[in-house]
């Protein structure tokens, strides 16, 4: 009997996770099936009860459930608690365990491009939502020199930067306009918002007029693969990191938690790229 895995979110019609995971099940000869379940917020508790009843072996959690899912799990690991969000759930002996692979998945994609030590990095994170919190938490763990949060709502950025502050990493908050004026002081800039995602591909989270060519510019969006934000950064001579690496890495880490098997990340990447027409 096939082992059932899935994705809980709303909406989920755009998700490429089923394609990626089902291909890996096939390649690794693992008797599993992954399905995306569209779950409205009011139905989340019932969906989790359904997952237990169906004896699902594990599932991913996406927008808008990453925070509220924590109320319905038996245990949440330390990093997910610190982040305040769960994106991966594993069933063990009838108990549901929550983890977060977003931050580590992103970190691994960033390490492919950032070659200087993390304690020398001054990072600007655009956005203050769940993805920003996952990334901020792992960057603090890596002891980056400073993290600045720029957000449309300054109060939210201030609250988040206060949570991140540590003895090794100084944290501050800026408005988007203030961040634009200080852009040249950052060595890494990360867009964690949905600004620039298909179909609004001409939008940018902020102006890159003051960007230094020494800066690494990263966007979590992977559709389109190269956002206008990344395109303009590249034109200014900066190194860029698209969102595909994080998407593949967080999926691969979840796959390992569920199955104990290590999927081929390059094949996962190619599978998603083909679907995106890349």
UniProtKB/Swiss-Prot annotation:
Shikimate binds at residues 15-17, 62, 87, 102, 222. Gene3D superfamilies: Leucine Dehydrogenase, chain A, domain 1, NAD(P)-binding Rossmann-like Domain. Keywords: Amino-acid biosynthesis, Aromatic amino acid biosynthesis, NADP, Oxidoreductase. GO terms for molecular function: NADP binding; shikimate 3-dehydrogenase (NADP+) activity. Pathway: Metabolic intermediate biosynthesis; chorismate biosynthesis; chorismate from D-erythrose 4-phosphate and phosphoenolpyruvate: step 4/7. It is an enzyme of class 1 (oxidoreductase). It holds the Pfam family Shikimate_DH. NADP(+) binds at residues 78, 127-131, 151-156, 220, 243. Its EC number is 1.1.1.25. GO terms for biological process: amino acid biosynthetic process; aromatic amino acid family biosynthetic process; chorismate biosynthetic process; shikimate metabolic process. Involved in the biosynthesis of the chorismate, which leads to the biosynthesis of aromatic amino acids. Catalyzes the reversible NADPH linked reduction of 3-dehydroshikimate (DHSA) to yield shikimate (SA). Belongs to the shikimate dehydrogenase family. This is Shikimate dehydrogenase (NADP(+)).
């Amino acid at each position: 009997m096939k082992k059932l895995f899935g994705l809980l979110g709303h909406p989920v019609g755009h998700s490429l996770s089923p394609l990626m995971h089902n291909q890996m099940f096939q390649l690794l000869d693992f008797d599993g099936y992954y399905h995306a379940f569209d779950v409205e917020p009011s139905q989340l508790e019932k969906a989790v009860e359904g997952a237990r009843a169906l004896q699902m072996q594990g599932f991913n959690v996406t927008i808008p459930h990453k925070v509220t899912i924590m109320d319905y799990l038996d245990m949440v690991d330390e990093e997910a608690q610190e982040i305040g969000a769960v994106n991966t759930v594993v069933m063990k002996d009838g108990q549901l365990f929550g983890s977060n692979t977003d931050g580590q998945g992103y970190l691994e994609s960033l390490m492919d491009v950032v070659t200087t030590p993390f304690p020398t990095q001054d990072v600007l994170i655009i956005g203050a939502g769940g993805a920003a919190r996952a990334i901020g938490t792992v960057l603090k763990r890596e002891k980056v020199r400073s993290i600045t949060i720029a957000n449309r709502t300054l109060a939210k950025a201030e609250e988040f930067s206060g949570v991140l502050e540590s003895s090794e990493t100084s944290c501050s908050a800026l408005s988007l306009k203030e961040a634009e004026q200080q852009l040249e002081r950052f060595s890494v800039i990360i867009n964690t918002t949905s600004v620039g995602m298909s179909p609004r591909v001409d939008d940018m989270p902020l102006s890159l007029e003051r960007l230094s060519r020494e800066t690494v510019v990263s966007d979590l969006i992977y559709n389109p693969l190269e956002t206008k934000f990344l395109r303009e950064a590249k034109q200014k001579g900066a190194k860029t990191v698209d969102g595909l690496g994080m998407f593949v890495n967080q999926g691969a880490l979840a796959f390992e938690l569920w199955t104990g098997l290590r999927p081929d990340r390059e094949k996962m990447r190619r599978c998603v790229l083909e679907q995106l027409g890349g």
